[in-house]
Amino acid sequence: MAVDYSLYLVTDRILVGPKDFLLSIRKALEGGVTLLQLREKETNSREFYDIGVKVKELAAEFGVPLIINDRVDLALALDADGVHVGQQDLPLAKVRNIIGPDKILGYSVSSLEEALQGERMGADYLGAGPVFPTGSKKDAAEAIGLAKLKEIKAGVSLPVVGIGGIGAANLRAVKETGIDGVSVISAILSQEDPCAAAKGLMDLWRN
């Protein structure tokens, strides 16, 4: 599957609120989001599944691949396009064995060593960061900065997406590292108009 990593939205239902969640995602997709990750850390499996069904329908309507954060079981149950795992989740090779060769497998990294490990173990893309300090993840590690992001991209052949503290003010600088896309949460979902926010980020990325 050819994947456009340019603008990768990670969801946060707590940030948006349950009432406006699906509408915000729709608006973000209308604005040009190219990849969508459903991340639900504060919910049970059934609720995650029910939300996932609706989000998958939205993603399919716009032809955007849906990635599930962490939950390999729910990625399979939903027949999502892929799954994204971190350093503390199931081993990458085990995840690849479970999901098979055709699903997209993403891996969170914060160093070149972790990136090379991800490449060896079958990741399709790497989420590198946090690039800048971020308030969207309570457990976020120390920011890696642009120099390390550039080092990670130069050291692997996989697509690399920058994540963490990225928004309109710093997106151009992030792009200059040579990475393949940016992953955002609040830069779209915290904005009054998620559609306009996504369009603005895509304009910055493409120009």
Swiss-Prot record:
What protein name is recorded for this chain? Thiamine-phosphate synthase
Q: In which pathway does it act?
A: Cofactor biosynthesis; thiamine diphosphate biosynthesis; thiamine phosphate from 4-amino-2-methyl-5-diphosphomethylpyrimidine and 4-methyl-5-(2-phosphoethyl)-thiazole: step 1/1
> Which sites bind Mg(2+)?
70, 89
Which residues does the annotation say bind 4-amino-2-methyl-5-(diphosphooxymethyl)pyrimidine? Answer: 37-41, 69, 108, 137
Q: Please state the Enzyme Commission number of this protein.
A: 2.5.1.3
Q: Which Pfam families match?
A: TMP-TENI
Enumerate the catalysed reactions. Answer: 2-[(2R,5Z)-2-carboxy-4-methylthiazol-5(2H)-ylidene]ethyl phosphate + 4-amino-2-methyl-5-(diphosphooxymethyl)pyrimidine + 2 H(+) = thiamine phosphate + CO2 + diphosphate; 2-(2-carboxy-4-methylthiazol-5-yl)ethyl phosphate + 4-amino-2-methyl-5-(diphosphooxymethyl)pyrimidine + 2 H(+) = thiamine phosphate + CO2 + diphosphate; 4-methyl-5-(2-phosphooxyethyl)-thiazole + 4-amino-2-methyl-5-(diphosphooxymethyl)pyrimidine + H(+) = thiamine phosphate + diphosphate
| HAMAP family, sorted | TMP_synthase
Q: Which family does it belong to?
A: Belongs to the thiamine-phosphate synthase family.
Q: Which GO terms describe its cellular component?
A: cytoplasm
Q: Which UniProt keywords are present, listed alphabetically?
A: Magnesium, Metal-binding, Thiamine biosynthesis, Transferase
- What CDD domains does this protein map onto? TMP_TenI
BP GO annotations: thiamine biosynthetic process; thiamine diphosphate biosynthetic process
Give the Gene Ontology MF terms in alphabetical order: magnesium ion binding; thiamine-phosphate diphosphorylase activity
Report residues binding 2-[(2R,5Z)-2-carboxy-4-methylthiazol-5(2H)-ylidene]ethyl phosphate: 134-136, 165, 185-186
Q: Which cofactor does it need?
A: Mg(2+)
Annotated cofactor note = Binds 1 Mg(2+) ion per subunit.
Q: What this chain does, per the record?
A: Condenses 4-methyl-5-(beta-hydroxyethyl)thiazole monophosphate (THZ-P) and 2-methyl-4-amino-5-hydroxymethyl pyrimidine pyrophosphate (HMP-PP) to form thiamine monophosphate (TMP).
